[in-house]
């Protein structure tokens, strides 16, 4: 299954707010329903609940079905909580790191910067959005002038307290902001509200 490129509002109306996909906020159809309407709704099956959690994770991080399944398989083979390791793998992707640093408004826009070869990791150009960042990695945003003003305005508007503790943003060189990966992200700093166990359960027979 290919990556979704359709209207983003349609997705967040169905799956609720996804900060990585879009910074627009909408009230989901579930919340818009009146009390009488809710009482008439059929009971949602456990499969549908797990499917929705999986879809929220996939669309927020901009993954294909195959990519997410591969991440689940990697998480299952690692020591520790499969769900937390899965979230860790997704949060440590280069495109997500740029998003969490506040350099770009969404993960798709981070992916564009990376694909255009404007991002360096440890002084080497990386053009793979799924690149796995590690502690002590240094990420340099070497965007051309056309991007610099946009990035500068974005960083100025982004509150520093929104940057999670495992990351640090340095503006000592305004034209080349740098991000530092301090350590692996912990569960409390995950940017998406989700029950990762539902995702693991969804893939229990596939991974």
UniProtKB/Swiss-Prot annotation:
Predominant location: plastid
Places the protein is found: Plastid, Chloroplast
Cross-referenced PROSITE patterns: RIBOSOMAL_S4, S4
A GO term for molecular function: rRNA binding
UniProt keyword terms in alphabetical order: Chloroplast, Plastid, Ribonucleoprotein, Ribosomal protein, RNA-binding, rRNA-binding
GO biological process, one term: ribosomal small subunit biogenesis
CDD domains to which the protein is assigned, alphabetical: S4 (cd00165)
Domain S4 RNA-binding: 92-156
Coiled-coil regions listed in the entry: none
Signal peptide positions on this chain: none
One GO cellular component term: chloroplast
Domain of life: Eukaryota
Family recorded in the similarity comment: Belongs to the universal ribosomal protein uS4 family.
Oligomer and partners: Part of the 30S ribosomal subunit. Contacts protein S5. The interaction surface between S4 and S5 is involved in control of translational fidelity.
Function description: One of the primary rRNA binding proteins, it binds directly to 16S rRNA where it nucleates assembly of the body of the 30S subunit.
Protein name per UniProt: Small ribosomal subunit protein uS4c
Species, as recorded: Equisetum sylvaticum (Wood horsetail)
Gene name in the database record: rps4
